[in-house]
């Protein structure tokens, strides 16, 4: 009946039936504030790796800033982890109004190229705290070789950034215009990687 009443409504939300005991358990949990289990903070290993990556992504030169913006706009959906024998945590690359070393003040926008409404954006690694689902899990491993590769692709080439591109929607939504000063080969190789 729902399908005929609302042909464009999509699949209805629903949960499998739960027993009275399970329902009471959920209800009591919610009454108690719905507290989630504690998530361990990042390991010292991850913290050290984050410090190195954030130092790379947040340098003052316009060349670094534009490169970081390009990288962010391509990695914002990734679940990032750092090479180790037993990776335990995933991170998201986010935009923040605060520099490394300070608490992250997340810049929430609908799209990665929307206007952050701050004069300087910092790219930070925030620990992923949500449940990771297979259909949205895009793991991305970061290591020293990847960092060197990004340097070779975006910083080493001889080009000059004289000003940061606008976040005005018409311009920012066109990556060919926004990142036109970055060498084509750098962008091409980045996409292949």
List each model region and its residues:
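Aromatic- and Gly/Pro-enriched helix-to-coil junctions and flexible linker segments
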Residues: 1-193
């Amino acid at each position: 009946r729902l399908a005929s009443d609302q042909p464009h409504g999509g699949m209805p939300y629903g949960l499998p039936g739960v027993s009275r005991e399970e329902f009471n358990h959920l209800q009591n949990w919610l009454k108690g504030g719905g507290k989630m289990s504690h998530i361990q903070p990042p390991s010292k290993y991850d913290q050290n790796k984050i410090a190195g990556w954030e130092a790379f992504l947040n340098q003052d030169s316009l060349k670094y800033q534009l490169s970081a913006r390009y990288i962010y706009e391509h990695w914002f959906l990734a679940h990032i982890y750092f090479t180790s024998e037993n990776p335990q945590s995933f991170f998201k690359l986010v935009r923040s109004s605060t520099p490394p070393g300070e608490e992250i003040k997340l810049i929430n926008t609908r799209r990665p190229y929307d206007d952050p409404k701050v004069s300087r954006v910092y790219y930070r690694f925030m620990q992923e705290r949500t449940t990771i689902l297979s259909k949205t899990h895009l793991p991305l491993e970061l290591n020293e070789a990847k960092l060197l590769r990004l340097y070779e692709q975006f910083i080493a080439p001889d080009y000059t950034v004289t000003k940061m591109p606008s976040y005005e929607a018409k311009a920012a939504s066109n990556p060919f215009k926004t990142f036109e000063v970055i060498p084509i080969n750098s962008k091409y190789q980045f996409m292949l990687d």
